Amino acid sequence: MVNTKQIVIFGAGKIGRSFIGQLFGCSGYEVVFIDVDPVIIAGLNEKKSYRVAIKGNIDQEIIVPNVSAISAFDRDKVIEAVSKSGILAVSVGKNVLERIVPVIAAGVEKRYSMDPEVPLDIILAENMRSAAEFVRQILIQNLPLDFVVDEYVGLIETSIGKMVPIIPQTELEKEPLVVFAEAYNMLILDAKGFKSPIPQIKGLAPKSNIKAWVDRKAFIHNLGHATAAYYGYTLHPELVYLYEVLEDPEVLLFTRAVMLQSADILVTAYPDDFTFSDLEAHINDLINRFRNKALKDTIFRVGMDLVRKLGHDDRFMGSIHLGMQYKMPYDLILKAMSFGFFFKAKDEGGTGFTSDSKFLKSLEKNFESSLTEILGYDPVIDHPVIEKLIGLYKQPGVIV
């Protein structure tokens, strides 16, 4: 029997707990997390709740009740949970997502054998474009050839705008289950992705054209965030927090200009979804949120993982490709991106991101081949961009 007031969430990480679990848990749902961290699993099962610390002008806290957890290594229990849950959510990142979807498929198949009339909706709380098709293909590969995936499984893409900083180790030692987050609490998701009625949850914001909103998140929010980190680090490598570099008017104005250039592109690409004034207001709000001192978001966290953030379909190149498609200027976006090739920020313990160090060394060895072989740039389609980046790379620390 399906429990319509239960959500199973793959990933008891920062977004899973501070956002998805919090929205559903505080709306009367039973929340079941699937995770690999034994400390988190044991803690959730013991306390049956956890605390979300809201960081802002006035600190607040939310206690999320009615919570439990299952180890991702307990395949049978995970399949059973999937088969009986009212709705699923995943927040694990692309690499892990690829590994868990086959288990979800097994749960879907079991569910269908018990109750073929009750479809399963899966909220894809991932920062990736085309997440629904990515998951759909893996489901198809792991279900019987005649399984009605498109009729029985709803794949709901999202635009995750909530900012969640790294929690200091001293805080985790005192309270392992706590998560920090900003007050922003709107989950934008695909209204057309649901097979069952959309849950009546405060904070859900269904949209009819989710692609536009996913691109807005990537090409304004993520783009601006990374721009502030990369340019801020270039000018102020000694600083730790994002709000600190945004106190420099030069960093602030350049970040805003880059975001506005991307807004121009988005308005051209999605005229039925956005106006420039809408996006300008969104940018102003985002910059205020980026400057939230209480959040203590580090330059390291915002800029780290260069291979992903400078990749061929992420925040910079994705917006550049859209600009190329509509013959729109993207020079500021390109310049902002170029600062990322010199980003060497370290965490508060003085440690860098391991894969970033390897990537930066590969750039020094052969810049152009690193763009094509590691970041996935197309040597033909992206040739004009590659040529400009080569020129910018030869001028390290150039000031805008």
Where are the model-predicted features located?
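Substrate/ligand-engaging "lid" and interaction regions
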Residues: 2-8, 14-400
